[in-house]
From Swiss-Prot:
Its EC number is 5.1.1.11. Gene3D superfamilies: 3.30.300.30, 3.40.50.980, ACP-like (1.10.1200.10), Chloramphenicol acetyltransferase-like domain (3.30.559.10), Luciferase, Domain 3 (2.30.38.10), Nonribosomal peptide synthetase, condensation domain (3.30.559.30). Large multienzyme complex of TycA, TycB and TycC. This is Tyrocidine synthase 1. Pfam families: AMP-binding, AMP-binding_C, Condensation, PP-binding. Binds 1 phosphopantetheine covalently. InterPro entries: AA_adenyl_dom, ACP-like_sf, AMP-bd_C, AMP-bd_C_sf, AMP-binding, AMP-binding_CS, AMP-dep_synth/lig_dom, CAT-like_dom_sf. It catalyses: L-phenylalanine + ATP + H2O = D-phenylalanine + AMP + diphosphate + H(+). The lineage of its organism: Bacteria, Bacillati, Bacillota, Bacilli, Bacillales. In the first step of peptide synthesis this enzyme activates phenylalanine and racemizes it to the D-isomer. The keyword Nucleotide-binding applies. Residues 528-602 form the Carrier domain. Its cofactor is pantetheine 4'-phosphate. NCBIfam families: AA-adenyl-dom, NRPS-para261.
Length: 1088
């Protein structure tokens, strides 16, 4: 009975999917576009950054270029290369090629040169369309055909009418190159009819109309761009091209979609996981494609819009099946790939190409109008993959190599790959191609590449190899990077003595070992604590670093620790009546070593109420010396989220205690006799403002929150206070707590203290306990007073020769700029962000520093020097380095748990002349950083506090134009059991300079402000600049150069087998690097 029912289902399905749905069968892509241009001539067709074209304008420009191509010999099925940056011109070029009768081949300019060269040669393209900024690359790869540089073509005088060239739906439209098993990419040939069918499908299934605004997210070399481009342009809708900078910044991406009111977007699921539905309210359809989606991701989005999961290889005109998440179902448990789209046939077959019944696993094969013509110049592969369709005589069927099965509801479940092809971050990758590249290396005898899954269910590539001679992972990575695009590079390379085999003597891929992320690093066995002090340190390290198991011989740096977290360790020791200097932890980075420096202390910091005048610290004097416009609007802020909601009364009780506890938060600033006086008001008056808003009926929660937070930012009053603003936003899906504090009284470490106190106090209040916060350390007032004394002591004045030497070496050479404009305002500031992947960040934090015993700042600055050497062509550069400013310079002082603005600023000279070899430059940077006395804290004290007669010949003439600051793992401190970082990050977006929320009318205080922090396990670097001084392209070049050099440093350090020490690691004063190298070489020769 059940078998008969299954047969009925299968028969019904076959009948349904072979029914023809009408579409524009006799028309080509450009004809369908021309119909839209005629129907909607004045509607916006395409938008990129600040430029837009109407359908009429886009059509006319494409017609003009098409006529030029005809004169150059383009005709039916001619192959034309399109090698351009993502832009409006890119789309014009594609339409022009189609109108002239040709087929376009998109070539990604970021591909390795070998791959670009191969695609140009293999496709036999006689013409390449490009832009001036890319034209040199076309020539550099050895292309000898005709190059048409669109920027230089005189097209305006040409006829703008449609060409009406003869065309057929079976003409070639485009050739997409994808990964191939032979080690070379293969070109898939697609015809017009497949896209003509999609036009009808878009309108029938998605209801796409001229009212829609559709995003172009994908790279133009990826077939998803064809889907996005023609979904809009064949329906009269507007196409919005997303820049790489917007795509690489999740917050900017969300803002762009909302601000431009996009209605349809197609994204890889791996990208969508970083977005928040409430922040993109204009979307009506979300489509995921390129790799498998997940039930949690679907459930997160499906009730906010139409969620579509799409599947389809390049060989079938992009899309073969879709599945729409049911809106009437509370949650989904799995995500199938759905049912075939119109005029597309799906067959699940066995090895003999016989149909399998519902529930049986088999190979997924595809037929229908979207099928590709085959592979360019690969008749053998075409015959293998495009076989005669046994179910429809006279037609072909594409064998995908995917494993799938029909479900009883008529949908298809995707089960993975039969062969060794995978999809990672939306890219279909033939593992055999990577293996072939590795096997071409002269020292590699065997190579296997597989896709593995990390703890976050994300996929990565891992290469295993056997080599007869020494071939390190770093060497292989460099070699592969010259042959393969970035998305095909394995994340890890593992050397094996032999490959695991199955009983049939085939490589057992399932038995390949997981990569050791700490490969080539010394890994001591676990050593438990032996004393009470060691046990306390282990507990504190586990809490601060977020690591469950830590032994007493584990290295603080290797566990990802940095100087800011070292301060947190010191602060938490204070609650055990134990004292440790931060420098001791940094110098002796294992618990076994540093426990010897931990001392009991009976001295307790004053826990009473502080009031009265407080001397300005150096950084505060710097601030008032700048005479910024709107000094009241120079804040830092955060937004916290609690799904269960916050109790307003509890929040106020906790804030009352926090403001009472931390004296700096009660400051005001008066002008007396031409001077700024900092005054602590004690407990009198309004010490903070609290606001509560009920947004449960608000349709746009994000907009409401961001509007109010900006109002609060601009309402600070330095003279009268308060300088703390708190706002509670209650919504249907949890509450959001906004905290804004003027920068004069808070810094990055202060925020960590406040988050901890807020969590502690809130938990106590919820449990019905009295609020009792951890003890504070010495007051901000005491610290400032001690600095006044320290400023003229011999200990500090002994630093003067170092700073005098730096001034004498520094040449005041201006940073190159695109526009020589001064007095720029914050409203002109733009941000560009780059990110490292989590695995790259982990390598930087936990492994890279072991090679040369460096700190993270050493490596970040080494990369900065290499980037500026490449970008600026200067011989040297002086940067302003920002530090936390809580150095151990005053013996009796303990400010590890004190709130206030402690930041130090000091100049660092980077030599840009001798940047090779890489190992020497890393060591040189480290040694130069170690020579800076006391982490640079003394420089600003000398400048702003020391008596002029005690400053020697210091002139403080050095005026760096670049500021660099690494903030550490900031967002981890916002995650507690009670609250997390809010997805409404308007208040978290610290502002135009990458750190602070400043008045738009405030002056830009540095030409380039570079800020690094760890966010969501990723290193994020923000490059802030004024658009009145720099073009976006210039900063993009700098940021990309920085990322390239930083990754090279990480790779170099993590693959280094031996730890190499430098003079600063030893106590011999005056030892030079060259002398130490000689000593080590002598030792090595002696021991041979």
């Amino acid at each position: 009975m059940l078998a008969n029912q299954a047969n009925l289902i299968d028969n019904k399905r076959e009948l349904e999917q072979h029914a023809l749905v009408p579409y524009a069968q006799g028309k080509s892509i450009h004809q369908l576009f021309e119909e839209q241009a005629e129907a909607f001539p004045d509607r916006v067709a395409i938008v990129f950054e600040n430029r837009r074209l109407s359908y009429q304008e886009l059509n006319r420009k494409a017609n003009q270029l098409a006529r030029a191509l005809l004169e150059k010999g383009v005709q039916t099925d001619s192959i034309v290369g399109v090698m351009m940056e993502k832009s409006i011109e890119n789309v014009i070029a594609i339409l022009a090629v189609l109108k002239a009768g040709g087929a376009y081949v998109p070539i990604d300019i970021e591909y390795p040169r070998d791959r670009i060269q191969y695609i140009l040669q293999d496709s036999q393209t006689k013409i390449v369309l490009t832009q001036k900024s890319v034209s040199q690359l076309v020539h550099d790869v050895g292309y000898s055909g005709e190059v048409v540089v669109l920027d230089e073509e005189q097209l305006d005088a040409r006829e703008t009418a449609n060409l009406h060239q003869p065309s057929k739906p079976t003409d070639l439209a485009y050739v997409i190159y994808t990964s191939g098993t032979t080690g070379k990419p293969k070109g898939t040939m697609l015809e017009h009819k497949g896209i003509a069918n999609l036009q009808s499908f878009f309108q029938n299934s998605f209801g796409v109309t001229e009212q829609d605004r559709i995003g172009l997210f994908a790279s133009m070399s990826f077939d998803a761009s064809v889907w996005e481009m023609f979904m809009a342009l064949l329906s009269g809708a507007s196409l919005y091209i997303l820049s790489k900078q917007t795509i690489h910044d999740f917050a900017a991406f969300e803002h762009y979609l909302s601000e431009n009111e996009l209605t349809i977007i197609t994204l890889p699921p791996t990208y969508l996981t970083h977005l928040t539905p409430e922040r993109i309210t204009s979307l009506r359809i979300m489509i995921t494609a390129g790799s498998a989606s997940s039930a949690p991701l679907v459930n997160k989005w499906k009730d906010k819009l139409r969620y579509i999961n799409a599947y389809g290889p390049t060989e079938t005109s992009i899309c073969a099946t879709i599945w729409e998440a049911p809106s009437n179902q509370l949650s989904v448990q799995s995500v199938p790939i759905g049912k075939p789209i119109q005029n597309t046939h799906i067959y699940i077959v066995n090895e003999d190409l016989q149909l399998l019944p519902t529930g049986s696993e088999g190979e997924l094969c595809i037929g229908g109008v979207g099928l590709a013509r085959g592979y360019w110049n690969r008749p053998d592969l075409t015959a293998e993959k495009f076989v005669d369709n046994p179910f429809v005589p006279g037609e072909k069927m594409y064998r995908t190599g995917d494993l799938a099965k029909w479900l009883t509801d008529g949908t298809i479940e995707f089960l993975g790959r039969i062969d060794h092809q995978v999809k990672i971050r939306g890219h279909r990758i033939e593992l055999g191609e990577i293996e072939s590249v590795l096997l071409a290396h002269e020292h590699i005898t065997e190579a296997v590449v597989i896709a593995r899954e990390d703890q976050h269910a994300g996929q990565y590539l891992c290469a295993y190899y056997i080599s007869q001679q020494e071939a390190t992972p770093a060497q292989l990575r460099d070699y592969a990077a010259q042959k393969l695009p970035a998305y095909m590079l394995p994340s890890y390379f593992v050397k094996l003595d032999k490959m695991p085999l199955t009983p049939n003597d085939k490589i057992d891929r399932k038995a390949l070992p997981e990569p050791d992320l700490t490969a080539n690093q010394s890994q001591a066995a676990y050593h438990p604590p032996r004393t009470e002090t060691e046990s306390i340190l282990v507990s504190i390290w586990q809490n601060v670093l977020g690591i469950e198991k830590i032994g007493i011989r584990d290295n603080f740096y290797s566990l990802g620790g940095d100087s800011i977290q070292a301060i947190q360790v010191v602060a938490r020791l204070h609650s055990y009546q134990l004292k440790l200097e931060t420098k001791d932890l940094l110098n002796y980075p294992t618990i076994e070593q540093v426990a010897l420096f931990v001392k009991s202390t009976t001295r307790k910091s004053d826990q009473g109420i502080i009031a009265g005048n407080v001397p300005l610290t150096p950084i505060q004097k710097w601030f008032f010396g700048k005479n910024f416009t709107n000094t009241g609007h120079w804040n830092q802020s955060s937004v916290l989220y609690r799904p269960e909601g916050f109790d307003p009364k509890v929040i106020q009780s906790v804030m009352d205690k926090i403001i009472e506890h931390h004296d700096a938060l009660r400051m005001v600033y008066q002008h007396e006799n031409g001077n700024v006086v900092q005054h602590n008001r004690g407990l009198g008056g309004q010490l903070y403002d609290f606001f509560s808003y009920n947004l449960t009926a608000q349709p746009d929660v994000q907009q409401a929150i961001e509007a109010e937070t900006q109002r609060l930012h601009s309402s600070m009053n330095l003279q009268e206070g308060p300088l703390v603003k708190v706002a509670l936003f209650q919504t249907l899906h949890g509450d959001h707590l906004f905290l804004a504090i003027h920068h004069l009284v808070v810094d990055g470490i202060s925020w960590r203290i406040l988050f901890e106190d807020l969590a502690t106090g809130y938990a106590q209040a919820l449990a019905g306990q009295a609020i009792s916060l951890p003890e504070k350390t010495d007051s901000f007032q005491s610290w400032s007073q001690w600095l006044q004394e320290y400023a003229n002591e011999a200990d500090l004045l002994s630093e003067i020769p170092y700073w005098e030497s730096l001034e004498s070496q520094a040449k005041n050479v201006s940073l190159p700029k695109d526009y020589e404009v001064t007095d720029c305002k914050q409203k002109s500031v733009r941000n560009m962000r780059i990110r490292l992947h989590p695995e790259e960040t982990e390598q930087l934090l936990k492994h890279a520093n072991q090679a040369y015993q460096t700190e993270i700042n050493d490596l970040l600055l080494a990369a900065l020097g290499l980037a500026f050497a490449e970008w600026s062509k200067l011989a040297q550069i002086v940067i302003h380095l920002e530090g936390h400013g809580r150095e151990d310079i005053i013996e009796q002082a303990n400010v590890a748990r004190t709130v206030g603005w402690f930041t130090s600023q000091y100049p660092v000279l980077l030599d840009l002349k001798q940047t090779a070899p890489l190992s020497d430059y890393i060591k040189l940077t480290k040694e130069n950083m170690r020579k800076i006395p006391r982490k640079g804290i003394g420089y600003d004290i000398l400048k702003h506090v020391t008596l002029p007669e005690n400053r020697g010949s210091l002139s403080f003439r050095v005026q760096p134009e670049v500021t660099f600051n690494y903030l550490g793992q900031f967002d981890a401190d916002m995650r507690t059991e009670l609250f997390t970082r809010s997805p409404y990050s308007g208040g978290n977006t610290l502002g135009a300079d990458g750190k602070n929320n400043l008045s738009p009318e405030s002056e830009v205080y540095t030409a380039l402000n570079i800020t690094g922090l760890i966010e969501g396990g990723e290193l994020v670097l923000t490059f802030s600049y004024s658009s009145e001084q720099y073009r976006e392209e210039s900063i993009q070049q700098l940021s990309q150069s920085y990322q390239k050099h930083l990754l090279a440093i990480i790779a170099h350090c993590t693959e280094k087998k031996e730890v190499e020490r430098t003079p600063s690691d030893f106590s011999v004063k005056g030892l030079q690097m060259e002398e130490m190298d000689d000593i080590f070489e002598l030792l090595a020769n002696t021991l041979r």
